[in-house]
């Protein structure tokens, strides 16, 4: 798995062309109206839909007010620096409502549930599940066959660029609403209890709980049974 350097991300954001994409439903005498070079138009007769940058489409609307009867604008961002990840070629299960930004790496057979938010530079390993409303901040790295519970937060580190990102090693279970602070590494096979706040590294094959989180025991057979990762949920 590849970890994106913080300065690469900062440079990407700085130099990216900021975008305010819109979808406009429009009605009027639309023939011959130029909505800008980047616009895509789907017009039949006197009605249509236009996709493009608001700056260009707004200028066209204002220049042709006498021809346009009505319009409605759909808009969900302003001067956005980072597009969303193109999901069509990802070999993973990604449910509606997940927000995944560009330059995120998602391993095969991963599962991203509704409402999860994954920021630029994050890595999700093969067979890992990111549950509902979990947040992976910038550059957070999760290994293979993990489960990041609902509402859990893995802190992001893009600024300052020298900060060490969160690293979750393979076969880790992070409980619901747990928080892993920047710079923390959670060792292979560990379990982080629900609601824990993890401020220091977690040794492999241990269970941590509490605020701040402390090791409460080593992984035993009972814990393994309660935290089993089901591959059936990861099949495509």
Curated annotation (Swiss-Prot):
Xref: Pfam families: DapH_N (PF08503), Hexapep (PF00132), Hexapep_2 (PF14602)
GO MF term set: tetrahydrodipicolinate N-acetyltransferase activity
Function: Catalyzes the transfer of an acetyl group from acetyl-CoA to tetrahydrodipicolinate.
EC number: 2.3.1.89
Alphabetized InterPro entries for the sequence: DapH, DapH_N, Hexapep, Hexapep_transf_CS, Trans_hexapeptide_repeat, Trimer_LpxA-like_sf
Keywords: Acyltransferase, Amino-acid biosynthesis, Diaminopimelate biosynthesis, Lysine biosynthesis, Repeat, Transferase
Entry similarity comment: Belongs to the transferase hexapeptide repeat family. DapH subfamily.
EC class name: transferase
Catalytic activity: (S)-2,3,4,5-tetrahydrodipicolinate + acetyl-CoA + H2O = L-2-acetamido-6-oxoheptanedioate + CoA
Gene Ontology biological-process annotations: diaminopimelate biosynthetic process; lysine biosynthetic process via diaminopimelate
Pathway membership: Amino-acid biosynthesis; L-lysine biosynthesis via DAP pathway; LL-2,6-diaminopimelate from (S)-tetrahydrodipicolinate (acetylase route): step 1/3
Protein name per UniProt: 2,3,4,5-tetrahydropyridine-2,6-dicarboxylate N-acetyltransferase
SUPFAM superfamilies attached to this UniProt entry: Trimeric LpxA-like enzymes
């Amino acid at each position: 798995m590849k970890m994106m350097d913080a300065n690469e991300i900062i440079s990407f954001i700085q130099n990216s062309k900021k975008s305010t994409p819109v979808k406009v439903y429009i009605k009027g005498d639309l023939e011959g109206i130029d909505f800008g070079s980047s616009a895509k138009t789907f017009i039949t007769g006197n009605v249509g839909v236009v996709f493009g940058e608001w700056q260009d489409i707004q200028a066209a609307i204002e220049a042709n007010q006498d021809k346009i009867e009505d319009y409605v604008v759909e808009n969900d961002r302003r001067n956005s620096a980072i597009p969303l990840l193109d999901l069509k070629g990802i070999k993973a299960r990604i449910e509606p409502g997940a927000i995944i930004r560009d330059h995120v790496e998602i391993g095969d057979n991963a599962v991203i549930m509704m409402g999860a938010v994954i920021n630029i530079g994050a890595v999700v390993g093969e067979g890992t599940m990111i549950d509902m409303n979990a947040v992976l901040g910038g550059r957070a790295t999760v290994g293979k066959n993990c489960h990041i519970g609902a509402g859990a937060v893995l802190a992001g580190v893009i600024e300052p660029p020298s900060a060490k990102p969160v690293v979750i090693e393979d076969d880790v279970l992070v409980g619901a609403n747990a928080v892993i602070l920047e710079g923390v590494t959670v060792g292979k096979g560990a379990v982080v209890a629900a609601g824990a706040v993890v401020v220091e590294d977690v040794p492999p094959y241990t269970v941590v709980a509490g605020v701040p989180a402390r090791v409460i025991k080593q992984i035993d057979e009972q814990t393994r049974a309660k935290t089993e990762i089901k591959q059936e949920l990861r099949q495509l």
